[in-house]
Amino acid sequence: MDKVETQTSRTQFAFVRLDITPPEDIYHGLWGAAAQHAATGIHKNIFADILVFQKLGDSSQSVIMILLDHVMFEESQQEMIKEKVQNISDNLKILVTFSHTHSAGFMYSDRVKFPGGEKINPYLELTRDNIKEATKKALDQLEDVTITFEYGQCGLATNRDYKDRKRDQFVCGFNPEVIPDQTLLVGRVSDANDRILCNLVHNCSFHKLPLV
């Protein structure tokens, strides 16, 4: 009988999802060709996912992954999130990452002078507070889990640094000569009763853009 080896890890884990949808009229001029600065409505809500990992039988350090549905934040804005969460405990190792959606507003500090920009700082402050509370909740919900994972391949990624040889310069365009990293890692997190808590997908390495 054939046997398939499955990669697994045992750890403590918790997952909390937090709604971080900004005000519908916040600054949104992410694209240079945008015809307006402030958003005019909300198509879908956006979220922050708080993932907590802790070694079995060792509470000396917890790894906190904060996954934000935003394109990016300034480094100082990321540090303020980390500092806020770090106030919970000195035993936290915190990582902030982004889905890189281009549809969630642009929260850079130099945007506050534009229409809708006055809502950026209050939104970020509220988001930091809510992330801290969600992290506390996740830490209180830590439980023993099994993470089953496997590597695969995702062919969506392409290289977009194309060398225009006529002009002797790089342009933003499809480059068929370079094969990007297409490694895909997927995981399933299950509790002691084999109930699935969440699924994890990592390194789907393509730049997510809407069709415009």
Where are these regions (language model features)?
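Conserved beta-alpha junction segments in alpha/beta enzyme cores
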Residues: 1-97, 101-212
